[in-house]
Amino acid sequence: MAELPIAPVDRLIRKAGAARVSEEAAKVLAEHLEEKALEIAKKAVALAQHAGRKTVKAEDIKLAIKS
């Protein structure tokens, strides 16, 4: 189950042009976004650790997204 709130995901889909969005559609997208975010976060943590830091910085996130 996704930890991301459904309402903001619903708004994103509407912003993309949808007139109506089913709750299930918003849940599915939220789950996918959460999986992708977790993947990026894990890469960013590894980058921070490699640099000898415990703190994940924006640069780690940016590099993780690019890789």
UniProtKB/Swiss-Prot annotation:
GO CC annotations on file: chromosome; cytoplasm
Pfam families in the cross-refs: CBFD_NFYB_HMF
Domain of life from the UniProt record: Archaea
Molecular function terms, GO-annotated: DNA binding; protein heterodimerization activity
Keywords recorded for this protein, A-Z: Chromosome, Cytoplasm, DNA-binding
InterPro entries per record: Archaeal_histone_HMF, CBFA_NFYB_domain, Histone-fold, HmfB-like, TAF_TATA-bd_Histone-like_dom
Location in or out of the cell: Cytoplasm; Chromosome
Reported phenotype of the disruption mutant: Cells can be transformed but grow about 75% as well as wild-type in liquid culture, some differences in transcription occur; double histone deletions (htkA and htkB) cannot be made.
SMART domains cross-referenced by the UniProt entry: TAF
Signal peptide as annotated in the record: none
Positions of region (Interaction with DNA): 20-22, 54-57
Family: Belongs to the archaeal histone HMF family.
Quaternary structure note: Homodimer or heterodimer. Dimers then assemble into higher oligomers, with the DNA wrapped around the protein core. Higher order oligomerization of these structures can give rise to long, superhelical fibers (in vitro).
NCBIfam families: archaea_histone (NF043032)
Function: Binds and compacts DNA (about 120 base pairs per nucleosome, corresponding to four histone dimers) to form nucleosome-like structures. Histones block elongating RNA polymerase (RNAP). HTkB/HpkB has higher DNA affinity than HTkA/HpkA and compacts DNA better than HTkA/HpkA. Participates in both transcription activation and repression in vivo.
Further remarks about this protein from its record: In a chromatin histone fraction 83% of the protein is this histone. Cells have about 2.5 x 10(6) histone proteins per cell, enough to coat all DNA with a ratio of >1 histone dimer for 30 bp of DNA, cells are polyploid with 7-19 genomes per cell.
Protein name: Archaeal histone HTkB
Organism: Thermococcus kodakarensis (strain ATCC BAA-918 / JCM 12380 / KOD1) (Pyrococcus kodakaraensis (strain KOD1))
